[in-house]
Amino acid sequence: MPELDIQFRALKAKDDKTVFCSGNIELDRFFQRYAGQNQFRHHIGTTYILLTGNKIVGFITVSAGEIAVDDLPSQSRSRLPEYPLPVMRIARLAIDKQFQGLGLGKKILRFSFELALDMKSHYGCVGVVVDAKQESINFYHKLGFLPLETLVGELGDRPQPKPMFLSIKTIEQAIKK
């Protein structure tokens, strides 16, 4: 398949989100119903879309967050202060099912890494945190994310997501390549 002509941009209120279908009901519902509300009304996250032509083929929602130094992987704790540290949190990420398997998930993550570097230079950021669903853990692990310690809890019949972390230093090294 030829290389897709893709672009990234922030979600706009007028964007038609109804035709996007990742095959995951929860992600599709979030994108179609809540991404705009969270961005334009509540201001708790920003959704960026991946477009080919006028078609939305993927999205990522990010927000600012914090992490305690003791929750970081041991190799990321060196010389950090003992108070909550700023991170960029990936809240949701999905690719339209017609475009899955083409490497667009990696491209949208690389875009998010640029956002994390921008956050670092403007406000501070020690890394990126994601709560990976069971089926996505290997995807994030291959990209260098490390598992975080988790609290044991109950979510009913839903599997518990795995918190994972990628340090800003690792992101800087990857972007330079």
Specify the residue positions occupied by each region the protein language model found.
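Short amphipathic alpha-helix that is part of the acyltransferase structural core
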Residues: 1-41
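Conserved beta-hairpin
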Residues: 44-64
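Conserved acyl-donor/pantetheine-binding loop and adjacent beta-alpha core of acyl/acetyltransferases
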Residues: 59-92, 100, 154-157
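Conserved acetyl-CoA-binding loop-helix of GNAT-fold acetyltransferases
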Residues: 101-115
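Conserved GNAT acetyl-CoA-binding A-motif
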Residues: 109, 116-131
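C-terminal "cap" of GNAT-fold acetyltransferases
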Residues: 124-126, 131-134, 149-177
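Conserved active-site tyrosine of GNAT-family acetyltransferases
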Residues: 130, 140-141
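Conserved acetyl-CoA-binding loop of GNAT-fold acetyltransferases
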Residues: 141-150
